[in-house]
């Protein structure tokens, strides 16, 4: 007898769709069963104001194969983001958060924030109007080891922000360490975190042992197994502070398989299926719905989706590559079997 599991339609609380001709592919994959997604603003040029965010949202809507998927837009914080722009974004009703990228931390973050001191007026305005702060939690100093950047960020940057803005809702995105799990668990109810499928499925050995696997290279970088296990424990615990955010971040194959390859894993082709595999292995399939469908909207003060999707325990083969505009993207688990599929 085939095993099935029906859950409330999930959402993706951290997604990169990119822009231009690739939107038809990225929007197709996510909108297949995600009700909503928080859209990252690190385009070129970045989405730094309300007008740019609304124009980007219109392009996403135009790329939808069918109606029903809602992109939740964000602003890209810079040293020059004003309190007035935050208020304007909030008033639009379409912009739900602002994203703090430390300058140079990840893809297209060169225009990011150089010092939290420079965005204090924007943060105060966000606290006043109820706009969420989304954070890429890594320091970028060249003398800091790449595997330590999240841990040091928690101490040096995030802790002071949390202390200075006690009513600001904060999402520490794509957490990768036991340190981040502990920080979020010990913080107030205004602090939460997203966890990606690839940080749950893989650790740095998967990326580096027996040959380097560029399609597992992402930022924040995969960490030790002990950190992977801490993430699995957090995600499958039922704790309301942790929720689904794929950080699905496609790059064309030639940008990944290169002497200096780009950071990012493409998981939107099989997002909920990947999470289901992890939760099943942890003996926690009963906790998947809260993680994928309840905790995110609850934290954002948005209604949960009213419809459902059904997962079936049925193997299928992930293709070697997928269309990405006029190029190709190699998805996570390319040429491998998935154990679950969405009906």
UniProtKB/Swiss-Prot annotation:
Catalytic EC class: hydrolase
Keywords linked to the UniProt accession: Hydrolase, Metal-binding, Pyrimidine biosynthesis, Zinc
Residues binding Zn(2+) 1, per UniProt: 14, 16, 99, 247
Membrane-spanning intervals of the chain: none
Catalytic activity, reaction form: (S)-dihydroorotate + H2O = N-carbamoyl-L-aspartate + H(+)
Biological processes annotated in GO: 'de novo' pyrimidine nucleobase biosynthetic process; 'de novo' UMP biosynthetic process
Entry-annotated residues carrying N6-carboxylysine: 99
Pathway(s): Pyrimidine metabolism; UMP biosynthesis via de novo pathway; (S)-dihydroorotate from bicarbonate: step 3/3
Binding site for Zn(2+) 2: 99, 136, 174
Top-level taxonomic group: Bacteria
Assembly behavior: Homodimer.
Family: Belongs to the metallo-dependent hydrolases superfamily. DHOase family. Class II DHOase subfamily.
NCBIfam families reported in the protein's UniProt record: pyrC_dimer
Protein name: Dihydroorotase
Species this chain originates from: Psychromonas ingrahamii (strain DSM 17664 / CCUG 51855 / 37)
Name of the coding gene: pyrC
